[in-house]
Amino acid sequence: MNIKYILTHPIQYQSPLIRFLNKNININVAYRSNISLRSYYDKDFDKKIIINNKLLVGYKHVFLKHFGSNEVTNVKPITTEFVKNILSNNIEIIWLHGIYNWYNFVIILLAKIYKKKVFVRTETNNLKKNSLFKNILKKIYYKFIDIFIDCYLSIGTENKLNYVSHGINPKKIFNVPYVVDNDFFFIKNKQKSKKFRILFTGKLIHRKGCDILIKAINILNKDLKFKRRTEIIIVGEGQMKVKLLEFVKKNNLDNIKFVGFKKQNLIKTYYKKTSLFIMPSREENWGLAVNEAMASKNAIICSTSVGCSKDLVKNNYNGYIFKNDNHKDLARKIHKIYKNPKKLNKFKINSYKIISKWS
């Protein structure tokens, strides 16, 4: 079986999966841009990102020639190397990540002309409420494009529900869960600490909701014992950092520590130090950092708008789910775990049990 997997650019979460699949099937990746192989400015992180040289190790790949900018958007980069590198005779399956950009739309149509099977994987869900008009447009689009697609690869429950809501036959949907390298993040012996440590990782932007977490801590810090016994570690950079720091300083939230942006291999050291991972996102298609934290034996709290919550977070088993954009509810959930160390330890063990079967 020869598969051509088409992606915009090398991504740290995609490469381990591709390497794993390449052990048993012949997979060749076509990238439209090499932007992630050089240092570049990330607007959301508000920081220059240094390249990861291991993104291309362990599988066959090609970079398609393009003209103009190699910036990754819904339109760019522009390439015309459809037939030569994507639709050659030895390719049986075209696998696409995403369905709405013009490039993938054209490839889907051409693939059928060249009698290739088309697999599609997206990250979309119904957690973000769209207008009635937008939902109607999506249903019309899916009804047309579905004619040319052989199967949909679902990353989780919310993603599958999204396909079905747009009229896709469930028989065409196959589970290909969103995963990380559990072995890489597995921590046999957690670092012991007298403090109750909480971890947030991500871009410091409105969508990621770090401000919700900080407001929750501001409520909890009214209990001085909580303030003395806890440490909240914020890993990340972004446009909201200055405002967040101002709020922390104004309210004397001394137990909140900002440690800046860290590469994936360094984030692992923070998972080792902490007991509770919080993803307070206002919108999140999946949330792979939850996978990482669970593989590192952390209890989990995430918002109702995090895509992985139905699959990975079980209320009162390995953590809690709080109401989206509600810092008071988040504070209540944190306090439930903080005041019950035995429950916390059970949650940590149960997190690893769940994620071990999600690999």
Please give the residue ranges for each predicted region:
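Donor nucleotide-sugar binding/catalytic pocket of nucleotide-sugar-dependent glycosyltransferases
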Residues: 134, 142-187
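Short alpha-helical donor nucleotide-sugar binding micro-motif in glycosyltransferases
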Residues: 261-262, 269-274
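Aromatic "clamp/platform" in nucleotide-sugar-dependent glycosyltransferases that forms part
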Residues: 282
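Nucleotide-activated donor-binding/catalytic signature segment of Leloir-type glycosyltransferases, i.e.
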Residues: 242-262
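A short, well-ordered alpha-helix in the C-terminal region of glycosyltransferases
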Residues: 329, 336, 343-357
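Short hydrophobic beta-strand element within catalytic cores of glycosyltransferases
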Residues: 299-303
